[in-house]
Each structure stands twice: as C-alpha cells, then as structure tokens.
Curated annotation (Swiss-Prot):
The keyword Nuclease does not apply. GO terms for cellular component: proton-transporting two-sector ATPase complex, catalytic domain. Belongs to the V-ATPase E subunit family. The keyword Transport applies. It comes from the Bacteria. The lineage of its organism: Bacteria, Pseudomonadati, Spirochaetota, Spirochaetia, Spirochaetales. One of its GO terms (molecular function) is ATP binding. Produces ATP from ADP in the presence of a proton gradient across the membrane. This is V-type ATP synthase subunit E. Keywords: ATP synthesis, Hydrogen ion transport, Ion transport, Transport.
Length: 199
C-alpha cells in the first residue's frame, strides 16, 4: 500500500506538473500572441502617424511655396504699378513744362489753326492762368485771322495747354497736358512695359 500511495503521489505530482506546464505554455502563448498584436497595432499606428506627418509636412511646404510665389507676384505687380505711375507722372510733368512756354504754345496753336481756319470758324480755349499772356501773343501773331473767325476764350477746365473747338460742327480737340500726356503714355506704354518686364 505504501507503494500505491507513493505511486499515487508521484502520479498526482506528474499530472500537476504537466497541467501546470500546459497552463504555463498556454499563458506564454497567449501573452506572446497579445504582445505580437500590440506590436503590430503599434507599428501600424506609427506608420499611419508617419504618413500623416509626411503629408502635413508636404502640404505645409506646398502652401509655403505657393504663398511665397504669390508674394513675389504681388511685389512685382506693385513695383510695375509704381514704376508705371512714376513714368506717367514724369511724362505729365515734362509735357506741362513744355506747355508752360507761351511761345511754343502760340506757335502750335497757329500751325493748327492755319490749316483749320479755311474750313470753319474756331474757338481757342486757354487756361485762365495763362490766358492774358498767351492771348496777347496770339493776337499779335494771328492778326487778321481773328477777324476771319478765330475767337480766343479763357476756360476753367484746362490746367495747361488749350482746346480748339470747331464752331460749325461742335467738335472739340483737346490739347491739354493731361490729354497729350495720356496719348503719349498710350503710345509709349508697350515699349515701357517691355522695359520694366520682370517676369
């Protein structure tokens, strides 16, 4: 009987050890499986986070580059506008300077009226500030033509220069600083654009 008890104890020990080993192996297997799943999920999350970060970095770079390009375009357009405005103002100043010379203006008016007086009566409109000085010069140089149908009048709407109106047709020709400068600017503008063309 003693052997039977010993055998029974040995058997219980053996069965207990086997069961404990089996349970231990199951626990280790499940732990490894769970660890592998956790690592796989972590790697997947890291990959997704890395892809998202790379996309955000690329988007930021693209937006920054687009913003830089737009800023450069705006700067170029601003510089072109400023240069154009400066050129236009300088042109107007130069025309105004030329038109400040009463001798030049009187010669110009006489040349224009010489060809038009044959067709119809004319009204020469001068700016008010230059009227008295220019009227005297024109009266001397035009002489009898004033009796033939040329009338000289002051006009508030002209800063420098003059306007000539054909009485019969009502047509008016504007030789003011602003109009002459605008015509010259329109003529010179394509060349000017070519000179300042940056991009």
């Amino acid at each position: 009987m003693q052997f039977e008890v010993k055998d029974l104890i040995n058997k219980i020990k053996k069965d207990g050890l086997e069961e404990a080993e089996r349970i231990s192996n199951d626990i280790i297997f499940k732990a490894k499986k769970e660890a592998e799943e956790i690592v796989a999920r972590a790697e997947e999350a890291v990959g997704a986070l890395k892809a998202k970060s790379e996309k955000e970095i690329n988007d930021y770079k693209r937006h920054a580059l687009e913003a830089s390009r737009q800023a450069i375009r705006d700067l170029i357009i601003g510089v072109e506008k400023n240069l154009k405005s400066l050129f236009e103002n300088t042109l107007k100043d130069n025309v105004a300077e030329v038109f400040s010379d009463n001798d030049f203006l009187s010669e110009l008016i006489i040349k224009i009226t010489d060809s038009w007086i044959k067709e119809e009566k004319l009204v020469i409109q001068l700016n008010e500030s230059d009227f008295s000085g220019l009227e005297q010069i024109l009266r001397l140089k035009l002489g009898n033509k004033l009796k033939e149908g040329i009338e000289i009048k002051p006009f508030k709407g002209i800063s420098k220069g003059f306007k000539i109106q054909k009485k019969n047709t009502g047509l008016q020709y504007d030789f003011s600083v602003e109009t002459i400068a605008d015509i010259l600017f329109d003529y010179l503008n394509p060349r000017f654009k070519e000179v300042i063309k940056v991009v």
